[in-house]
């Protein structure tokens, strides 16, 4: 039993009731009703100094209310006293940002935005942070891979707050009983899967475009040609990797969909790939198998030089500043403060104390990660995978990439199409959309190259 709060007070006198009169109750109810038209329920906090409130930096937090409240508290406690910059913090859903920006009612700074910074940058709606003189020193706080998706036309339009990537989880007890070791490569995983299958067990590998792209990077294949004018999924190397990827599900019986947490817990799926945040979830939700499983870097691809490339894809949530802000310098000061190790460490400690270990904050700041609650052995394994991260650089029309790679996968696995034919068909569709979007934004296309 955990006691959160304890209150001591004098013994109350029972039988005494305090009731407001009719007119007081009526006046209070009317006041509540009228206030419902003017109260901003999204507002978490405003500038402490009323004289500065009209000049307050407007910050939207696209996360839960608990997270927004912590941002507000840290801002009032640390940022405003040090800089003198008043800040108004609102808890607003990320889905509201686009419509508010179009209407000219958007914020100055957006915290915990989705990985959509590129789309705002492409439409000149995001402020280029790399134009600030001290940007390089601020960007050095992060792994290079976490900045890739925040770049457009040579400029950076956001800074990462959180960094996520996948790792491998395996049951040490089950593999030991079967005389197996954790796989280092995909080929080793395939060999292990046959033994597991004979024992009515399976392997959990996400059947998504991201898994294919990850394997593509591990094998040394390029995704784009001519600086993003078109994709290279129809090359021999890319098709070979795609064939290997689809064979996981066609030939080796890997499940297409599954609930990893419970299957891993029961032992039905003793090996699987999931975001490294799964580590905390398993420790909380499956205490009966504590000490019987481990987390390790992803299986990789054995290269010609004898080294194993186990690149994982990095996913970030970012902080950005909108281009129509009237307070760019103040906004930059806030972003620098918020992405610094002190603020990130404080936020991580606060959020874990409120929501528990399963909600541990995965800060993109390298120093804040070192300050986190992970123990030494856990940090060592995570850092090993962090040293092999990459990301897909966003391009105009990039939304078509994941969609059509998944369509190509379905056409092979569900409809029996040839991997080669599927990749030729859907690569053509992707490249056509790339050309269309590049024309829309006045960029060079494949057709221009042909001329």
Predicted regions: what they are:
Residues 1-116, 421, 428-451:
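Conserved N-terminal structural module of periplasmic/extracytoplasmic solute-binding proteins
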Residues 251, 286-358, 387-390:
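Extracytoplasmic/periplasmic substrate-recognition and gating elements
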């Amino acid at each position: 039993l955990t006691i959160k709060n304890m209150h001591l007070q004098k013994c109350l006198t029972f039988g005494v009731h305090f009731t407001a009169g009719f007119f007081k109750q009526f006046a209070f109810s009317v006041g509540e009703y009228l206030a419902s038209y003017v109260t901003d329920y999204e507002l978490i906090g405003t500038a402490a100094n009323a004289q500065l409130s009209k000049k307050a930096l407007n910050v939207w937090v696209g996360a839960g209310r608990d997270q927004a409240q912590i941002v507000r508290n840290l801002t009032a406690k640390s940022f405003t006293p040090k800089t003198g910059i008043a800040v108004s913090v609102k808890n607003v859903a990320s889905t509201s940002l686009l419509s508010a920006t179009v209407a000219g009612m958007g914020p100055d700074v957006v915290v915990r935005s989705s990985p959509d910074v590129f789309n705002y940058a492409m439409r000149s709606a995001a402020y280029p942070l790399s134009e600030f003189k001290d940007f390089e020193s601020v960007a050095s706080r992060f792994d290079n891979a976490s900045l890739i998706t925040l770049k457009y036309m040579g400029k950076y339009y956001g800074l990462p707050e959180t960094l996520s990537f996948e790792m491998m989880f395996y049951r040490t007890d089950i593999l030991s009983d079967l005389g197996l070791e954790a796989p280092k490569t995909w080929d080793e995983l395939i060999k292990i899967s046959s033994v597991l299958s004979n024992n009515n067990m399976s392997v959990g590998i996400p059947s998504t475009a991201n898994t294919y792209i990850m394997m593509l990077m591990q094998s040394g294949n390029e995704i784009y040609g001519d600086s993003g004018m078109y994709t290279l999924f129809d090359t021999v190397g890319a098709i070979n990797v795609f064939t290997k990827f689809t064979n996981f599900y066609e030939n080796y019986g890997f499940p297409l969909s599954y609930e990893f947490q419970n299957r891993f817990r029961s032992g039905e799926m003793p090996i699987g790939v999931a975001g490294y945040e799964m580590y905390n979830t398993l420790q909380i939700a499956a205490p009966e198998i504590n000490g019987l499983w481990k987390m390790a870097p992803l299986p990789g691809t054995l290269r010609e030089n004898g080294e194993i490339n186990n690149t994982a894809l990095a996913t970030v949530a970012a902080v950005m500043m909108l281009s129509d802000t009237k307070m760019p310098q103040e906004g930059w000061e806030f972003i620098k403060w918020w992405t610094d190790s002190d603020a990130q460490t404080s936020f991580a400690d606060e959020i874990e104390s409120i929501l528990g270990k399963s909600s541990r904050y995965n800060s993109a700041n390298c120093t804040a990660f070192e300050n986190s609650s992970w123990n030494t052995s856990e940090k060592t394994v995570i850092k090993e995978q962090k040293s092999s991260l990459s990301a897909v650089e966003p391009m105009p029309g990039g939304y078509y990439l994941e969609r059509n790679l998944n369509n190509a996968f379905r056409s092979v696995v569900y409809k029996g199409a040839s991997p080669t034919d599927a990749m030729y068909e859907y690569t053509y569709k992707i490249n056509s959309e790339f050309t269309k979007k590049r024309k829309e934004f006045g960029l060079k296309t494949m057709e221009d190259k042909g001329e």
